[in-house]
Each structure stands twice: as structure tokens, then as C-alpha cells.
UniProtKB/Swiss-Prot annotation:
Stretch list, region Adenylyl transferase: 449-946
Protein name, UniProt field: Bifunctional glutamine synthetase adenylyltransferase/adenylyl-removing enzyme
CDD domains listed in its UniProt record: NT_GlnE_GlnD_like (cd05401)
Source organism per UniProt: Escherichia coli O9:H4 (strain HS)
A Pfam short name: GlnD_UR_UTase
Upper classification of the organism: Bacteria, Pseudomonadati, Pseudomonadota, Gammaproteobacteria, Enterobacterales
Key word Nucleotide-binding present: yes
């Protein structure tokens, strides 16, 4: 045995001072001194358990002792009666055997291949023993999980990565996937659980038993992220669910991982063979598959970027020429040719490397250089980790650990060790580059593009740095990284085919480069990822954004400006087509062309297909709404024009809905026979409120009443004859139904018909005569106020003329000024008490004192007060033009009318923009103070003072 080097002999004196009495220096062999000097882990362990050292001296580790692990562990577990006892015994057993392995490794008593085998089999033994103990315990508690035939169902565990390949590190976490064969329920328990519940609960307990730190440490860190759907997926899957996932969604990196998958424990049982046969076609393709090279190149690129980003210098696993590159080289051949060459289907690297050489896929010299380098690197890695039982692949920077490694690797000093290491890694890198390297030098633009790809594909953590986000604040940078990570997790839950993932991987770096260049990157990205989640399973939409950069830019700018637009696009992705043409996107339909555009749009849909007609109406509305909002955001539409467009759009929709309802009713009942003597339909729709006043907002509902002029004795002329007035009632009901039916594109509009005579208690549709009579004899003052903002939005000329005459007559009635003033003021005060001031320290733009409703009440009061003297005041139904009329007719001073108009449009503009931001209609108490003071003064002047 090689003597300790000078630095280690000096360190031995420090070790001696730590040793307890039973481990006196003179009682220790030269071997014990060497191992205790090399490994703090062994040192700590034998200080805690001196009997282990005695055992090591009397029964030194053997290469084949892994064959006894299962029996030794069973003996240790035979008296365990609870989970706490199980956890303790597993941890002590793992530590005792790891000390033996470290001893053998440090002294080179066995080959490196034997060390890897022992480490892997130890993990398998512990996992299987824990599983079997817990399975029995869970069956006693919940019953035995069985399939439909009553056959007991086991939990199968796939060991992934180095565990599966029999090449586990000294200090490694373990990657596992849990599966069970068939669905069914437990039998024999106190209550029945389905198999999914049983195995999920058992899986959770198994992870806890292995992973949870206690005073005895842990057994292994357990990583379950390689399972289908990753962290967001079920903990345990049935064979059928596994098969569906890998056939439909399995990705290249999952094929790569599955090469090494090995069933823990009884690997020759019926269910184990079934699982293995099911997975094999996914991993090993029947044809020669050269697409693997690019996939592995991409994966290697991700690793290289991680090394750069995290500053992983001196990393013997991930660095250039490291262990990972040897694994990549071997698995390239397995994945390309494994389906045709069964001899390449081995999980272990070294046997596969021999097959590769035998098949002349690599030269004998290259294969031998890789084999030697692999064993050198793995020994160095395991020695490094055994110093402190620490999961690291980074070479030490301190002199003591460098001296330890140089001695254990049989080199005189650290420079000699690093020289040999460099030679091995250079050989590996050369072979790697010849096979799958991508050594072309990058341009600056390509480098930047690569950084965006890194941001998307490499699952950066919050504390990772990346230059492309350097301009953002620390909070925004973290939020962007979190959003990307959350989006990727969400994708794992979705059924996205290979083509969809390919398109996403092309789209996302471009999207991120555009979004993250903005100062509001975090907010914008949150809106866009929410939208993308809704369309990721529909590759066509992803391709639209990927292939049309201009559409992507419009999407980003609109989503940045308005969460309302982002929400609309997320709910109705068909609207993404609108992004293709900026000429139409930012140019709403002419106000007088909505009806014609809609008519043309509906020609594409069969007239007798009600469902498609309903969808088409909603899709047209949403597309037009998007254009109006886009123009609003771009600043090409002032607030009055926005409302004009929204109002004309609503009128076009009303026209089409009435037409559709009319056709359906006539087909069923025929037409009312009084129409034989006249043209038209004898029907009108009156718009109140914002619709009547040309003041619709983005989310306004429609206040409507329905009128007809059908005589009492009219009947329909169809085969199913009904009373004429009954026909109009059913027509109105049908109209309400067409507006409110929820399709996949939502509802058309919320419709409120409570402003009809007698409100909700009255008939849904009213005759023109009854309406006139009600307004003259029964209506309250507030109903006359509402009439100020009412107009016919659909109807025959003669019914329209009749309504206009009734409206004019009611509004020009002489009224006693003081009484009217009191009634209007008291109604407003009631409204304010009910609706206003709900938010402390906030100003409700519509409902609070000095807001929009006060201006509306002022105009309504003045029209009702003075229209008897000035009938021209009844001409318009919108507030802005009523204010003009009040000034023109010398009722209000022009300066006051203009000031109120400015205040009104300013407040309306703010409401529009709050709607685009999906924010409620209230602002800080200190906003719009000038406008509110002006409105208060006007209110005081007209509705309070004598």
C-alpha cells in the first residue's frame, strides 16, 4: 500500500486528536490510518460506531459481498415493527455498507467496476426492502390492491439513470418512476380504496421512508421528476397510463432517460416483463433514427450553457470531456441503432461500449480511450464524494482535499493528477465533437439567439443569472424566470404532440426576446403565457405565431396594453387570425358598415344551422371588439368614437338576432295576419341607457324593451296557428335566448329588459298603445328620466315614428320645477346610498358624487324641466349632444355645458381604459378632483338650489 503523502501525514495528527479511546492510534492498522485520513465520512462513522472499524479489520470488504446485502438487511429488519424503526434500520444499514465501500475504494481493494456495482445494488436492496415492508403494512391497513380478476397488484419501481445502469455514484440521489399494472380496488381492508389511491399513498410513504432526514441522516434523496408530466403528474401511474403517455407525448430526452431504466427487485416476474416489453418500442426504434443526434446535441448544449451560467468550472461530470459526454457518445449509438441491434440495448455503459467497438461503430482506439477515461473519471468522482459523503463533481480548491485525491488516485501531487485528467478529458472531447459536436463558431446574433433558447429550454432557477434579463429589476427578473418555469410545468400536464413541442421550441425564444426587451416584461409575459396555455394543444395557432413574426409582435403589444384583450384571445383563440393583417386590426369597420359586414359574414354559415349561426354571431362580435380595442389602444379612436363603434356593432347584432328569431318563429307559426295589410314586421326594439345614449363600453350589457303594434284579434297564418300577440311574446323570448345562450364562444350580450312597463313584473313585449298609456298614466319620474336616453335601435318606420312621438310627448309634458327637482335629487341620493362609496379612499367614477351618473341626472332633469318650452331638447338621446342643445337653447351657459362635456368624456375615457385593463371602475380618491368639483357645483346649481 502506498504511504501517505507529506500533507496527509501532517493531517493524520489532527485525526488522532478526534479519535475516542477505543480507537487509540496504536491499535489502528496502516490501512485504517490511510482511510481515516482520506475520508471524513468514514472517520465520523467509525467514531459513532467503533464496532464497524473492528468488523472492517477482521472482515475486509470483498468484491462479491453485494450478493449478501439483501440477507444482511433482512436480518436487520426482522424485528422492525413500525415505520420509525424501519427508517432507522435502513439509514444505519446504508451508512455501514457505505463505510465498507469507501474503505474498499480508498485502498483500491476492488476494481472501479465492482465499486459501481456495489453502490447500485446497495441502493436497489434498500429501495426494494422498504417497498416490500411498506406494501405489507399498507395491505394490512387498507387491503390488498387487486385487478378485476382478484389478482394482487404489485408496485413496480423503475430505477433510472445511473441507478438503472448499475453505475451509481458514491453520494447520489436516485431517480425513480412508480407504476402498477391494472386498475381495480383493494380487497380485505376496513374500507375499499381504488388502486390509484392505494399506490399513491404507498408511494408517498416510500419516498418519506427513503428521503426524509432524521437524526440518522437519510437513505437517499429521491427524485421523481422523470415520471410522465414531471412534478405536475400523478406520483404513480398504471401501465396503461404509462403506455399512453410514452406513445403520445414521449420526448427525446425521455427516450434518452429510459435507455437506462431498470425494474428494481424481481425483474423477471410477469408484470416486470410486461412493463419492459411495453417500454422497449418507445426507447429503441425499429428504424435507424438519426434525429437523435440533433436531440442529444441540443441536450448537450443545455448542459454546456448550465455549466457557463452556474460557473461550473472544474466539473468532471458536466464539463467538456466529462462523464456526461462519454454517456452521450454511447447513447447516441444505442438510440440510433438499438432497435436494429439488440446487443446495444444494455443499460450499462462499459458493456455497451465494448459492443460499439465490436460493431466497428467506433475505432478500437477511440473505444479504449473512452473506457479508460470513464473508469478514471468515475473513480475520481466517487473518491471526491466519499470524502464527505457529498454530492459534488467539482474538483476541490483547498490543499488538503487536493492532496487526498492525488494520493488516492496514485499520483505524486495535484499537478500530476490534473495533467492526467486533462489528457483523458481531451480525448473524450475529441470523440464527442467528431460524433455529435457542433463546433461552428457562433456569430453575435446567433449567440444572442442561443441565450434566448437557453432562457426557454434550460429551466433556470430564480437565482440564476442570464445577460438577456440584466436590464430588468431583481424582482422582475425573478418573476420572469418563475413564469417560464410555471409555464413549462403547465405544459407537462397537456397532451402536446412532438410537432407542437417543436413549434413551441421555435416560437418561445423569439417571443421571449420580444417580451423581455420591454420594461413591463413580467406583466406582459404573465398575460401571454396564460393565453398560450389555452392554445398549446392546437398546433395551428402556435404555427401562426411562429411563422408570422408581425402577428407575434401585434400579440405582444396588445397583451401588454390590455389584459382584457389577452383574456379575449385566450378564451377565443380564433381571434388570433385577426393579428395577421394590421390594416384591418387597427382599422375598425366603418360605423355604417357593421350591418353589411355581418350579413356577409353570416352568408358563410347555413341559415338552418342554428348552432353555427350562434357561433358566427359571437365570433364576429369578438373580432370587431378586438379591432375597436386595438384602435383604442393605438390612439386612433377617441372615446366618443369608441362608443360609437361599440354601439353600431351592438345594433348590427340586434338586427341579425331579430332576423334569426323572426325566421325561426315564422317557420314554426307563420306571420301575424295583420301584416298582410302593411309592410314590415310590426315589431321594434328600443335601446335604453348606454345603448340608447350611444355610450356603450367594452363590457356593457344592453337595456332593451320590445314593442309591437299587433291588434287584439290577429292570428298567425301558419299551420300551427297562434294568437298574434303570443307570437310577439315568443319572438321576444327567442331573441333573449339567442343573446344569452352560452356557446363555446360565450354569450353574445347580457340583456336587461327590466325597464319595460311594470319592470320585471310586466309583459316581456308590450303593444305600442299600452306603452304610451303606461308612460302617460303610470310611469314614475325615473322612468321618464330613462326615456331621455331611449331610442329605437331596430324597427319598422311606422313603429319608430310612433315611439318617437310618445317619447317627445312624455318629455315635453309641463312639470312643476320644484317637485321634479326633489324627485330627481331623491332618486339620485337613493342610488348613491345603494351603489356609491363602496370603496374607502376610492372614487367610483360612475356612481360616486361628482361622477358620470350625476352628469346624466343633470341632463335628464334639465330636459324634463324645459322640454315643454324648448321641444328641440328631445332630439338626441346622448349626453354630449343634449349638453350642446341645452347651451344652444339658452338653458345652460355654453361655458358650463362645454366644461361638463369635457368632464364627462374624460371620465368615460378613464372607464374605457380601466375596462381594457380589466380593472374595476374606481380610482384613487385624489384623481379627477377638478372634474368632480365642477360636477358638484353644477349639481348644486340645478338640483339643490331654489
Amino acid at each position: 500500500m502506498k504511504p501517505l503523502s507529506s500533507p496527509l501525514q501532517q493531517y493524520w495528527q489532527t485525526v488522532v486528536e478526534r479519535l475516542p479511546e477505543p480507537l487509540a492510534e496504536e491499535s489502528l492498522s496502516a490501512q485504517a490510518k490511510s482511510v481515516l485520513t482520506f475520508s471524513d465520512f468514514v472517520q465520523d462513522s467509525v467514531i459513532a460506531h467503533p464496532e464497524w472499524l473492528t468488523e472492517l479489520e477482521s472482515q475486509p470488504p470483498q468484491a462479491d459481498e453485494w450478493q449478501h446485502y439483501a440477507a444482511w438487511l433482512q436480518e436487520a429488519l426482522c424485528n422492525v415493527s413500525d415505520e420509525a424503526g424501519l427508517m432507522r434500520e435502513l439509514r444505519l444499514f446504508r451508512r455501514r455498507i457505505m463505510v465498507r465501500i469507501a474503505w474498499a475504494q480508498t485502498l483500491a481493494l476492488v476494481t472501479e467496476e465492482s465499486i459501481l456495482q456495489q453502490l447500485s445494488y446497495l441502493a436497489e436492496t434498500l429501495i426494494v426492502a422498504a417497498r416490500d415492508w411498506l406494501y405489507d403494512a399498507c395491505c394490512r391497513e387498507w387491503g390488498t390492491p387487486c385487478n378485476a380478476q382478484g389478482e394482487a397488484q404489485p408496485l413496480l419501481i423503475l430505477g433510472m439513470g445511473k441507478l438503472g445502469g448499475g453505475e451509481l455514484n458514491f453520494s447520489s440521489d436516485i431517480d425513480l418512476i412508480f407504476a402498477w399494472p391494472e386498475h381495480g380496488c383493494t380487497q380485505g381492508g376496513r374500507r375499499e380504496l381504488d388502486n390509484a389511491q392505494f399506490f399513491t399513498r404507498m408511494g408517498q410513504r416510500l419516498i418519506k421512508v427513503l428521503d426524509q432526514p432524521t437524526q440518522d441522516g437519510f437513505v437517499y434523496r429521491v427524485d421523481m421528476r422523470l415520471r410522465p408530466f414531471g412534478e405536475s403528474g400523478p406520483l404513480v401511474l398504471s401501465f396503461a397510463a404509462l403506455e399512453d403517455y410514452y406513445q403520445e407525448q414521449g420526448r427525446d430526452w425521455e427516450r434518452y432517460a429510459m435507455v437506462k431504466a431498470r425494474i428494481m427487485g424481481d425483474s423477471e416476474g410477469v408484470y416486470a416483463n410486461e412493463l419492459r416489453a411495453m417500454l422497449r418500442p418507445f426507447v429503441f426504434r425499429r428504424y435507424i433514427d438519426f434525429s437523435v443526434i440533433q436531440s442529444l446535441r441540443n441536450m448537450k448544449g443545455m448542459i454546456a450553457r448550465e455549466v457557463r451560467r452556474r460557473g461550473l468550472t472544474d466539473n468532471i461530470k458536466l464539463g467538456a470531456g466529462g462523464i456526461r459526454e462519454i454517456e452521450f457518445i454511447v447513447q447516441v449509438f444505442q438510440l440510433i441503432r438499438g432497435g436494429r441491434e439488440p446487443s446495444l440495448q444494455s443499460r450499462s455503459l462499459l458493456p455497451t461500449l465494448s459492443v460499439i467497438a465490436a460493431l466497428h461503430l467506433l475505432s478500437e482506439n477511440d473505444a479504449e480511450q473512452l473506457r479508460v477515461a470513464y473508469l478514471f473519471l468515475r473513480r475520481l468522482e466517487n473518491l471526491l464524494q466519499s470524502i464527505n459523503d457529498e454530492q459534488t463533481q467539482t474538483l476541490p480548491s483547498d490543499e488538503l482535499n487536493r492532496a487526498r485525491l492525488a494520493w488516492a488516485m496514485d499520483f505524486a501531487d495535484w499537478p500530476q493528477l490534473t495533467g492526467a485528467l486533462t489528457a483523458h478529458m481531451t480525448n473524450v472531447r475529441r470523440v464527442f465533437n467528431e460524433l455529435i459536436g457542433d463546433d461552428e463558431s457562433e456569430t453575435q446574433e446567433e449567440s444572442l439567439s442561443e441565450q434566448w433558447r437557453e432562457l426557454w429550454q434550460d429551466a433556470l432557477q430564480e437565482d440564476d443569472t442570464t445577460p438577456v434579463l440584466a436590464h430588468l429589476s431583481e424582482d422582475d427578473r425573478k418573476q420572469v424566470l418563475t413564469l417560464i418555469a410555471d409555464f413549462r410545468k403547465e405544459l407537462d400536464k397537456r397532451t402536446i404532440g412532438p410537432r407542437g413541442r417543436q413549434v413551441l421550441d421555435h416560437l418561445m425564444p423569439h417571443l421571449l426576446s420580444d417580451v423581455c426587451a420591454r420594461e413591463d416584461a413580467a406583466v406582459t409575459l404573465s398575460r401571454i403565457t396564460a393565453l398560450l396555455v389555452g392554445i398549446v394543444t392546437r398546433t395551428t395557432y402556435l404555427e401562426l405565431l411562429s411563422e408570422f413574426p408581425a402577428a407575434l409582435k401585434h400579440l405582444i403589444s396588445l397583451c401588454a396594453a390590455s389584459p382584457m384583450i389577452a383574456s379575449q384571445l385566450a378564451r377565443y383563440p380564433l381571434l388570433l387570425d385577426e393579428l395577421l393583417d394590421p390594416n384591418t386590426l387597427y382599422q375598425p369597420t366603418a360605423t355604417d358598415a357593421y350591418r353589411d359586414e355581418l350579413r356577409q359574414y353570416l352568408l358563410r354559415v347555413p341559415e338552418d344551422d342554428e348552432e353555427q349561426q350562434l357561433e358566427a354571431l359571437r365570433q364576429f362580435k369578438q373580432a370587431q371588439l378586438l379591432r375597436i380595442a386595438a384602435a383604442d389602444i393605438a390612439g386612433t379612436l377617441p372615446v366618443m368614437k369608441v362608443s360609437d363603434h361599440l354601439t353600431w356593432l351592438a345594433e348590427a347584432m340586434i338586427d341579425a338576432v331579430v332576423q334569426q328569431a323572426w325566421v325561426q318563429m315564422v317557420a314554426r307559426y307563420g306571420k301575424p295576419n295583420h301584416l298582410n295589410e302593411r309592410e314590415g314586421r310590426g315589431f321594434a326594439v328600443v335601446g335604453y341607457g348606454k345603448l340608447g345614449g350611444w355610450e356603450l363600453g367594452y363590457s356593457s350589457d344592453l337595456d332593451l324593451i320590445f314593442l309591437h303594434d299587433c291588434p287584439m284579434d290577429a292570428m298567425t297564418d301558419g299551420e300551427r296557428e297562434i294568437d298574434g300577440r303570443q307570437f310577439y311574446l315568443r319572438l321576444a323570448q327567442r331573441i333573449m335566448h339567442l343573446f344569452s345562450t352560452r356557446t363555446s364562444s360565450g354569450i353574445l350580450y347580457e340583456v336587461d329588459a327590466r325597464l319595460r312597463p311594470s319592470g320585471a313584473a310586466g309583459m316581456l313585449v308590450t303593444s305600442a298603445e299600452a306603452f304610451a298609456d303606461y308612460q302617460k298614466n303610470e310611469a314614475w319620474t325615473w322612468e321618464h328620466q330613462a326615456l331621455v336616453r331611449a331610442r329605437v335601435v331596430y324597427g319598422d318606420p311606422q313603429l319608430t315614428a310612433h315611439f318617437d312621438a310618445v317619447r317627445r310627448e312624455i318629455m315635453t309634458l309641463p312639470r312643476e320645477g320644484k317637485t321634479l327637482q326633489t324627485e330627481v335629487r331623491e332618486m339620485r341620493e337613493k342610488m348613491r346610498a345603494h351603489l356609491g362609496n363602496k370603496h374607502r379612499d376610492r372614487f367610483d367614477i360612475k356612481a360616486d358624487e361628482g361622477g358620470i351618473t350625476d352628469i346624466e341626472f343633470i341632463t335628464q332633469y334639465l330636459v324634463l324641466r324645459y322640454a315643454h318650452e324648448k321641444p328641440k331638447l328631445t332630439r338626441w338621446s346622448d349626453n354630449v349632444r343634449i349638453l350642446e342643445l341645452l347651451a344652444q337653447n339658452d338653458i345652460m351657459e355654453e361655458q358650463e355645458a362645454m366644461a361638463l362635456t369635457r368632464a364627462y368624456t374624460t371620465l368615460r375615457d378613464e372607464l374605457h381604459h380601466l375596462a381594457l385593463q380589466e380593472l374595476p371602475g374606481h380610482v384613487s380618491e385624489d384623481c379627477f378632483t377638478a372634474e368632480r368639483e365642477l360636477v358638484r357645483a353644477s349639481w348644486q346649481k340645478w338640483l339643490v338650489e331654489e
